[in-house]
């Protein structure tokens, strides 16, 4: 019997943001290996007899080592089972998919990758922030701030719109480095917490004040948007698709 592993993007939160392909795949899963940020309602889509394995993967919190996750995928696949590796957002956007695919490839396991709606792009929309605009922003860049010392802050400071992930513990560094390299201290900033979940919250501040305003709050998981497009939120912040 031949097994197969599916790396599936769960989107930003609500099960309604799953693709049809992802929903169909989950409904026939035999093993579900999922990250910490997956909405519990998505877990209800798998069969009752599906083995569910939580592997964490949340910044700063306890999680299963990547090598162990790779081993789980290979072992269950070699047992002839349909394995779903469920990741928040899109598997290929800061999803560490390369390590898992490499392990499957080296072990001769069959696999497929199903795209998901990236939280980096969905979060601003759900907060009422267009990340491009004919006047205010002709483009954007998405970066992770997991290792702030590795970033080229001089280059980032010149970009019209910045979308930052894993930055909740580095607000002081983000503000300091961007201002030091020429960004206006008054640049508007929005922080979208738990994007796409029922408890979604949006905070607004400026580059020079955000660390002081938000520093004492538990902010993870969040997406940070920096740029003049944040000012457009006042026109569309009320908009949420409700079916």
UniProtKB/Swiss-Prot annotation:
Residue positions binding S-adenosyl-L-homocysteine: 12, 88-90, 118-119, 166, 195
Gene Ontology BP annotations: cobalamin biosynthetic process; methylation; siroheme biosynthetic process
EC code: 2.1.1.107
Pathway assigned in UniProt: Cofactor biosynthesis; adenosylcobalamin biosynthesis; precorrin-2 from uroporphyrinogen III: step 1/1; Porphyrin-containing compound metabolism; siroheme biosynthesis; precorrin-2 from uroporphyrinogen III: step 1/1
PROSITE patterns registered for this protein in UniProt: SUMT_1, SUMT_2
PANTHER family: S-ADENOSYL-L-METHIONINE-DEPENDENT UROPORPHYRINOGEN III METHYLTRANSFERASE, CHLOROPLASTIC, SIROHEME SYNTHASE-RELATED
Designated name of the protein: Uroporphyrinogen-III C-methyltransferase
Source species of the chain: Synechococcus elongatus (strain ATCC 33912 / PCC 7942 / FACHB-805)
Name of the gene: cobA
């Amino acid at each position: 019997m031949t097994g197969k592993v599916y790396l599936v993007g769960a989107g930003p939160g609500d099960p309604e943001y799953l693709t049809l392909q992802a929903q169909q795949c989950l409904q026939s899963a035999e093993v579900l290996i999922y990250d910490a940020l997956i909405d519990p309602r998505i877990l209800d889509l798998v069969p009752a007899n599906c083995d569910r394995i939580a592997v964490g993967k949340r910044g700063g919190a306890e999680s299963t080592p990547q090598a162990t996750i790779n081993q789980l995928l290979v072992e269950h696949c070699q047992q002839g089972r349909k394995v779903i590796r469920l990741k928040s957002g899109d598997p290929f956007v800061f999803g560490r998919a390369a390590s898992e695919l490499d392990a499957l490839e080296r072990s001769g396991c069959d696999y497929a990758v199903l795209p998901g709606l990236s939280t980096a792009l969905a979060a601003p929309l759900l907060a009422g922030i267009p990340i491009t605009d004919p006047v205010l922003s002709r483009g954007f860049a998405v970066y992770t701030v997991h290792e702030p010392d590795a970033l080229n802050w001089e280059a980032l400071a010149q970009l019209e719109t910045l979308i930052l992930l894993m930055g909740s513990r580095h607000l002081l560094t983000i503000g300091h480095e961007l201002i030091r390299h020429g960004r206006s201290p008054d640049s508007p900033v929005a922080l979208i917490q738990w994007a796409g979940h029922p408890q979604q919250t949006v905070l607004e501040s400026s580059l020079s004040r955000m660390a002081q305003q938000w520093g004492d709050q538990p902010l993870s998981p969040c997406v940070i948007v920096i740029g003049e497009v944040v000012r457009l939120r006042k026109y569309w912040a009320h908009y949420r698709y409700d079916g």
